[in-house]
Amino acid sequence: MTTVCTADQMRAAEQTWFDAHPGKDLMAVAAHAVAVEAEQMLGAHEGRRVLILVGGGDNGGDGLFAATELASSGHSVELLSVLGIPHAEGWRAALAAGCRQVTPTDVLHQRYDLAVDSVLGIGGRPGIPRVLMRTDEWLVKSGTPVL
């Protein structure tokens, strides 16, 4: 993994964004950017299978709102909660958009066109939970592209 910036540098960048965009929703902007990149990775095909790896906190919220956009675009989107309590509003929105919750066991027997990692953000701590390690190992072995 390549370090792009530290958590403190990212917090400072976020604060700069908030200062420049008072009243705007950074999560909505981030989720839309993730959905746009996911669409580019999926190509011009509807009905692709997408797995969203969901963590607690705002990073998970970004992924859930991106999942909502992807489902609204006609993709089959599944949600795997792997760490913490998912962002409540994002979880409700994703389920209402037709996304489906799956278990780690479900995932191991499926094929996906894309996986979106929205587990850890700037609040992440050292040590990777076992379920996330197993899921990451499966993704590598399956050749599933990860955003």
Labelled PLM ranges:
Residues 1-48:
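Positively charged, low-complexity intrinsically disordered leader regions
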